[in-house]
C-alpha cells in the first residue's frame, strides 16, 4: 500500500515513483507513506514505523530530477530495511543509486 499525504500535483508522480520502485524490487507488500513538504532541514528522510511499514518525508523545494532522486534515495533505505542488507548507515549505497534509479525511472526501464 502506498499513501501520499498530499493533494497537490506531486501526488500522482510520487505514487508512480513508489509503485515503480516497489514492483521492480519485489516489495509490493511493503507499506509506504510519503509526506511531501515544502520546507525541511534536509532533502528527505525515511523511517521505519514497524515491520513492513515506512514513512518518507521529502522536500518539494528542489528541481524535478533532484526530487525524483531523493524519493529513490529514501526508497533504497526502505529496501535496505526490508532485506536487512546494508553497510554502515546505508547512505553510500543510497547516494550511489539515487540518480541511476531516477534516470531508469524516466527512461521507463
Positions of PLM-derived features:
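Acidic/histidine-rich, surface-exposed loop or edge segments in extracytoplasmic proteins
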Residues: 1-4
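Catalytic zinc-binding patch centered on the HExxH motif and its immediate surroundings
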Residues: 23-24, 28, 33-55, 64-65
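Post-HExxH zinc-binding segment in Zn-dependent metallohydrolases
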Residues: 87-109
Amino acid at each position: 500500500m502506498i499513501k501520499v499525504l498530499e493533494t497537490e500535483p506531486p501526488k500522482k508522480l510520487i505514487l508512480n515513483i513508489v509503485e515503480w520502485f516497489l514492483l521492480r524490487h519485489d516489495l509490493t507488500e511493503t507499506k509506504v507513506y510519503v509526506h511531501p513538504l515544502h520546507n525541511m532541514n534536509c532533502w528527505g528522510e525515511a523511517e521505519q514505523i514497524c515491520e513492513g511499514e515506512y514513512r518518507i518525508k521529502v522536500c518539494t523545494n528542489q528541481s524535478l530530477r533532484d526530487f525524483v532522486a531523493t524519493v529513490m534515495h529514501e526508497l533504497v533505505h526502505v529496501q535496505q530495511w526490508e532485506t536487512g542488507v546494508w553497510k554502515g548507515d546505508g547512505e553510500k549505497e543510497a547516494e550511489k543509486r539515487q540518480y541511476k534509479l531516477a534516470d531508469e525511472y524516466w527512461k521507463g526501464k
